[in-house]
């Protein structure tokens, strides 16, 4: 069995462990376990504490089950993190000392041609986070979308400045080519690119693939849903850590933090009140130069740390 470092390099591991402020007897929740990079490090810090790990990807879950099959301190759940509250009944835990969300796509997912997440490998246009339960692939969705709707998706989730030519080209390609692949899709996008975007092909392609993936997996809705219940899962003096990778996620998380930490100190009181929630660091934590050199894919990662007092 390959170890998790051979499959995927989790970002900001040292920073995550430091900021979780782990209690060896505490209960922790990793809502996006992936290939257990963060989870394994959390578990190393626990004695009688527990770790609940969740992931939507069955391949990740299978890996974690093999990795932790002898560990009674670990509970593994296969589901989208937006559905996590329905699983609380099977747990003896209702609140946690720390919760982690890493919103990035794993290196393993990107590197596997059959997953269809990357334009660098030729494979089916799949892009499903949950291949075991999701029926529609990205190719199916592209076939069913109108040019207008696809254009809106590219602009909203990929920040594509001139999405219409791309949408027209993609619709024509999926209708005329029976078994269109990821590299063929990338070729269509390159041919349809206009203006300045034509000269930023790699970044541009990544944004197009990102937009399709986000829409297919309903990532934004799922993130917003999770953020509504996470505060209720936190104990007092616990922390919530979230790692974002693109501006859409970051905006949602920043708005969430702003509302959660909004607090006005009453002037009339003789003592200062402690806000219910606070940011541990005013600015998001970024990867070190050493990590950037070892793992260039970490360059977009930003870690936010919120404490419930």
Swiss-Prot record:
<feature type="binding site">
    <location>
        <position position="109"/>
    </location>
    <ligand>
        <name>S-adenosyl-L-methionine</name>
    </ligand>
</feature>
<dbReference type="GO" id="GO:0071424">
    <property type="term" value="F:rRNA (cytosine-N4-)-methyltransferase activity"/>
</dbReference>
<dbReference type="InterPro" id="IPR029063">
    <property type="entry name" value="SAM-dependent_MTases_sf"/>
</dbReference>
<keyword id="KW-0489">Methyltransferase</keyword>
<keyword id="KW-0963">Cytoplasm</keyword>
<dbReference type="GO" id="GO:0005737">
    <property type="term" value="C:cytoplasm"/>
</dbReference>
<comment type="similarity">
    <text>Belongs to the methyltransferase superfamily. RsmH family.</text>
</comment>
<feature type="binding site">
    <location>
        <position position="55"/>
    </location>
    <ligand>
        <name>S-adenosyl-L-methionine</name>
    </ligand>
</feature>
<feature type="binding site">
    <location>
        <begin position="36"/>
        <end position="38"/>
    </location>
    <ligand>
        <name>S-adenosyl-L-methionine</name>
    </ligand>
</feature>
<keyword id="KW-0949">S-adenosyl-L-methionine</keyword>
<feature type="binding site">
    <location>
        <position position="102"/>
    </location>
    <ligand>
        <name>S-adenosyl-L-methionine</name>
    </ligand>
</feature>
<dbReference type="InterPro" id="IPR002903">
    <property type="entry name" value="RsmH"/>
</dbReference>
<protein>
    <recommendedName>
        <fullName>Ribosomal RNA small subunit methyltransferase H</fullName>
        <ecNumber>2.1.1.199</ecNumber>
    </recommendedName>
</protein>
<dbReference type="GO" id="GO:0070475">
    <property type="term" value="P:rRNA base methylation"/>
</dbReference>
<dbReference type="Pfam" id="PF01795">
    <property type="entry name" value="Methyltransf_5"/>
</dbReference>
<keyword id="KW-0698">rRNA processing</keyword>
<comment type="function">
    <text>Specifically methylates the N4 position of cytidine in position 1402 (C1402) of 16S rRNA.</text>
</comment>
<keyword id="KW-0808">Transferase</keyword>
<feature type="binding site">
    <location>
        <position position="81"/>
    </location>
    <ligand>
        <name>S-adenosyl-L-methionine</name>
    </ligand>
</feature>
<dbReference type="InterPro" id="IPR023397">
    <property type="entry name" value="SAM-dep_MeTrfase_MraW_recog"/>
</dbReference>
